[in-house]
Amino acid sequence: MPKRTLQGVVVSDKQAKTVVVRVDRRFTHPIYKKTIRRSKNYHAHDENDQFHPGDMVWIEESKPISKLKRWTVVRGEPKKTA
């Protein structure tokens, strides 16, 4: 069974070797047929502390690393500055 992979944005990097990633999902309400956007925060392991708030990252499911961390950062793109 393949590991799940999610795409999200880093919202916090204040913990050591950990980033908090916000993952957005969209779905259609079953009764009202309106498209709704929901988000969820995941704690992910960042071994080298290389990602910062605003960076786009991909996280992959892993074995439990701590009480809250069950995801690992696989790759990422730096925040675009204009």
From Swiss-Prot:
Molecular function terms from GO: rRNA binding; structural constituent of ribosome
Gene3D superfamilies recorded: Nucleic acid-binding proteins
InterPro entries tied to this protein: NA-bd_OB-fold (IPR012340), Ribosomal_uS17 (IPR000266), Ribosomal_uS17_bact/chlr (IPR019984), Ribosomal_uS17_CS (IPR019979)
Keyword field: Ribonucleoprotein, Ribosomal protein, RNA-binding, rRNA-binding
Keyword Ribosomal protein listed: yes
Superkingdom in the source lineage: Bacteria
Gene Ontology annotations for the cellular component aspect, listed alphabetically: cytosolic small ribosomal subunit
PROSITE patterns linked: RIBOSOMAL_S17
Annotated GO biological process: translation
HAMAP family: Ribosomal_uS17_B
Function, in words: One of the primary rRNA binding proteins, it binds specifically to the 5'-end of 16S ribosomal RNA.
Recorded family membership: Belongs to the universal ribosomal protein uS17 family.
Subunit structure: Part of the 30S ribosomal subunit.
Protein name, UniProt field: Small ribosomal subunit protein uS17
Chain's gene name: rpsQ
